[in-house]
């Protein structure tokens, strides 16, 4: 199993798909990295040799932040928004949608589970 950027890539998948298992690498960036490394996209992960893995690691370091570095940068950006007190920072702080989505209905992913409000009891005679 090839281990790149601290992630074990699935052996049976093509390398262009396997690289997308790394946080921060999508389809297009995967293709760019393979082109820089000079590796064919159709090769399987199990067929990579050590020199090809090293070339991928080198191309990856040159091109993008991935995994832990990227996650920490995103967290720092969110923290900065909260510290400066801008609208997006307030939305993050309150746990509400940030990008202008509606909140009257939906928004359950961001707000969490439904909070049920009890109705008033009807008095029976």
Swiss-Prot record:
Q: Which Pfam families match?
A: Ribosomal_S13
Q: Which GO terms describe its molecular function?
A: rRNA binding; structural constituent of ribosome; tRNA binding
Record SUPFAM superfamilies: S13-like H2TH domain
Q: Where is the composition biased (Basic residues)?
A: 105-125
Gene Ontology biological-process entries: translation
Disordered: region residues = 95-125
Keywords attached to this Swiss-Prot or TrEMBL record, sorted alphabetically, are: Ribonucleoprotein, Ribosomal protein, RNA-binding, rRNA-binding, tRNA-binding
Q: Does the keyword Transport apply?
A: no
Q: Which HAMAP family match?
A: Ribosomal_uS13
Return the NCBIfam families for the record.
uS13_bact
Q: How does it assemble?
A: Part of the 30S ribosomal subunit. Forms a loose heterodimer with protein S19. Forms two bridges to the 50S subunit in the 70S ribosome.
What does the sequence similarity comment in the record state about its family?
Belongs to the universal ribosomal protein uS13 family.
Its annotated function is as follows: Located at the top of the head of the 30S subunit, it contacts several helices of the 16S rRNA. In the 70S ribosome it contacts the 23S rRNA (bridge B1a) and protein L5 of the 50S subunit (bridge B1b), connecting the 2 subunits; these bridges are implicated in subunit movement. Contacts the tRNAs in the A and P-sites.
* Protein's name in the database: Small ribosomal subunit protein uS13
Question: Which organism is the protein's source?
Answer: Leptospira borgpetersenii serovar Hardjo-bovis (strain JB197)
Source species taxonomy? Bacteria, Pseudomonadati, Spirochaetota, Spirochaetia, Leptospirales
């Amino acid at each position: 199993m090839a281990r790149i950027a601290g992630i074990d890539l699935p052996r049976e998948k093509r390398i262009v798909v396997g690289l997308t298992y790394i946080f921060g690498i999508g389809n297009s960036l995967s293709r760019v990295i393979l082109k820089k490394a000079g590796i064919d996209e159709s090769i399987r992960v199990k067929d990579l040799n050590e020199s090809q893995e090293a070339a991928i690691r080198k191309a990856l370091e040159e091109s993008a932040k991935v995994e832990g570095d990227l996650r920490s940068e995103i967290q720092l950006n969110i923290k900065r928004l909260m510290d400066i007190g801008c609208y997006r920072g307030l939305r993050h702080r309150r746990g509400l949608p940030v990008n202008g989505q509606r909140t009257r209905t939906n928004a359950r992913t961001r707000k969490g589970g439904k909070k049920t409000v009890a109705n008033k009891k009807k008095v029976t005679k």
